[in-house]
Regions:
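Short, contiguous strand/loop micro-motifs
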Residues: 7-8, 70-74, 103-104
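Small-residue (primarily alanine) positions within well-ordered alpha-helices
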Residues: 13-16, 20-25
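Short glycine-/small-residue-rich flexible loop motifs, especially phosphate/cofactor-binding loops
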Residues: 21, 73, 85-86
Length: 114
C-alpha cells in the first residue's frame, strides 16, 4: 500500500468541515477529510426541511446570542452572507431566496449541496 501525504487533515465531514476542505483544496493543498459516521454531511440533508437553508440574508446582530457582540461583528465581517452565496455559486449551486431572507439551492434539494 502506498503511503499518502496530506497537507491538511479535517476531522468531521459536516458543513464546516466540508467548506474548510473545499477552501483548502482551492489553495492547492492536499486534503483528507475524516468522518466517523457512515455518511458525510448527513445533517445537511435535514436543514431547511430537506431543502438546505444554507444562509440567511438577515444577519442583524439581534439574530445572534453571544456575550461578546464584537465577536459576531468580526465573524460576519470576515465571511458574510454574500461570501456564502458566492462560495456555493462557485460550486455550481445557484441560490433562491424564500421566506424573505432564507437562501436555498435552486434545485430545492439539500442533496445538491452535499
Amino acid at each position: 500500500m502506498q503511503k499518502q501525504i496530506y497537507d491538511t487533515v479535517i476531522i468531521g465531514a459536516g458543513a464546516s468541515g466540508l467548506m474548510a476542505a473545499v477552501t483548502a483544496a482551492r489553495k492547492g493543498l492536499r486534503v483528507l477529510v475524516l468522518e466517523h459516521m457512515e455518511q458525510a454531511a448527513k445533517k445537511i440533508l435535514a436543514t431547511g426541511n430537506g431543502k438546505c437553508n444554507y444562509t440567511n440574508a438577515d444577519q442583524s446582530l439581534e439574530n445572534y446570542y453571544c456575550e461578546e457582540p464584537d465577536f459576531i461583528r468580526t465573524v460576519l465581517a470576515q465571511f458574510s452572507c454574500q461570501d456564502t452565496i458566492r462560495f456555493f455559486e462557485e460550486l455550481g449551486i445557484r441560490p433562491v431566496q424564500k421566506n424573505g431572507t432564507c437562501m436555498y439551492p435552486e434545485s430545492g434539494q439539500a442533496s445538491s449541496v452535499k
